[in-house]
């Protein structure tokens, strides 16, 4: 599976993953809205929005 792994508004980059899902985490801090993308579907702390999906590059 191919997942996007760029941070926030960086140019799109991808990585090949062993997992069958991709994630996109979104949260806000003193720098504004932050976005993290990667492989799998991790547990997140309260206040962090998590979207998990199961197709190539679905987390852009």
UniProtKB/Swiss-Prot annotation:
Signal peptide per UniProt: none
One Pfam family hit: Toxin_cobra-type
GO cellular component, one term: extracellular region
Tissue: Expressed by the venom gland.
GO molecular function: acetylcholine receptor inhibitor activity; ion channel regulator activity; toxin activity
Disulfide bond among keywords: yes
Primary site of residence: secreted
Cystine residue pairs: 3-22, 17-39, 41-52, 53-58
UniProtKB keywords: Acetylcholine receptor inhibiting toxin, Disulfide bond, Ion channel impairing toxin, Neurotoxin, Postsynaptic neurotoxin, Secreted, Toxin
Protein location: Secreted
Main function: Binds to muscle nicotinic acetylcholine receptor (nAChR) and inhibit acetylcholine from binding to the receptor, thereby impairing neuromuscular transmission.
Similarity comment text for this entry: Belongs to the three-finger toxin family. Short-chain subfamily. Type I alpha-neurotoxin sub-subfamily.
Protein name: Short neurotoxin 1
Protein's organism: Hydrophis cyanocinctus
């Amino acid at each position: 599976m191919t997942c996007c792994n760029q941070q926030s508004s960086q140019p799109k980059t991808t990585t090949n993953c062993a997992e069958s899902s991709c994630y996109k985490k979104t949260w806000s801090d003193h720098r504004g809205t932050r976005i993290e993308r990667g492989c799998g579907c991790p547990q997140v702390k309260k206040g962090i929005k998590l979207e998990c999906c199961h197709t190539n590059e679905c987390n852009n």
